[in-house]
Regions:
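Compositionally biased intrinsically disordered regions enriched in Thr/Gly
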Residues: 23-276
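Bacterial N-terminal signal peptides that target proteins for export
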Residues: 1-10
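C-terminal motif of bacterial Sec signal peptides marking the signal peptidase cleavage site
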Residues: 18-21
Length: 276
């Protein structure tokens, strides 16, 4: 009896194991190794546009110094019989390298206009020269033609200013001796603009006093101070290596037939000069 119960228990246990083995079982979640996971596709980010590097501004090359030449205005005027009654030759400045010296164009244009004006004046003088010739012929007097010669020199030039000094010599019929005239111009070295007295000096009264004192002292004109003061004209100046040069025209003072000049150093005029 015991044996039957034992067998029954064993059978029941085996049956239970069998039923457990045959019953449904949960499949475990498949484990996925990290390498098997699909790599996330990176989201497309907009490409950053490169910031353009500003190119450095080109530094303009400094203007070259003027290369000086000359422009000549010349003509010979004759009477009806072919006799020369007037001869003129005006040699004026010409900047040859206007491509490298921008001021040169304006300077050249100024002197071209000056030369043209001189030629117009010469045509007017021609009529008087012919009249003088006719009178001389009728009276049996010797006749000498009038001649005019103009030359120039570059008196001063630096990065700021250019000064031109001109001389005009006139030998006229009936004159005891040739007449000499002095002219001058000062230009802005960068633009070629012609600069007058007020563009170079700041105090006309002080400049006049110093210039008059210089003429009186240098030429012993103590008794003619008033005449010097009246004769002085502010636009009659130019620059030189030694300083500012001022002049009086010939014939403006007793016994003075040709231009006279005085030079005031740059140091002595520093307080009344725009350019120091």
């Amino acid at each position: 009896m015991k044996r039957i119960r034992l067998l029954s228990g064993l059978l029941a246990g085996a049956l239970a194991l069998t039923l457990a083995a045959c019953g449904p079982r949960e499949d475990p979640e498949p484990s996925v190794s990290p390498s098997a996971l699909p790599a996330p596709s990176p989201s497309a980010s907009p490409e950053a546009e490169p910031t353009p590097t500003p190119s450095p501004e080109a530094t303009p090359a400094p203007a070259a110094e003027p290369v000086w030449g000359e422009q000549s205005f010349a003509r010979t005027f004759t009477a009806g019989d072919g006799t020369t009654v007037l001869s003129v030759n005006y040699v004026l400045p010409l900047v040859q390298n206007t491509d490298a010296c921008p001021a040169g164009t304006a300077i050249n244009d100024w002197y071209k206009q000056e030369g043209s004006s001189r030629m117009l004046e010469a045509e007017e003088q021609y009529e008087m020269a012919v009249a003088d010739y006719d009178v001389s012929q009728a009276a049996g007097f010797p006749f000498s033609p009038t001649t005019q010669e103009m030359t120039y020199t570059v008196a001063y030039e630096d990065e700021n200013l250019i000064s031109i000094r001109r001389e005009l010599y006139v030998a006229a019929e009936g004159a005891a001796h040739p007449s000499a005239f002095l002219l001058a111009e000062t230009f802005d070295a960068a633009t070629g603009e012609k600069l007058g007295f007020s563009r170079v000096f700041t105090d006309a009264d002080t400049v006049r006093e110093r210039v008059v004192d210089a003429f009186v002292s240098q030429y012993s004109l103590e008794d003619s101070r008033d005449a010097v003061t009246v004769a002085w004209q502010p636009e009659r100046f130019y620059l030189s290596a030694e300083g500012y040069v001022f002049w009086l025209a010939g014939g403006e003072l007793p016994g003075v037939n040709s231009p006279i000049e005085v030079t005031l150093s740059y140091e002595s005029m520093e307080d009344v000069s725009v350019y120091g």
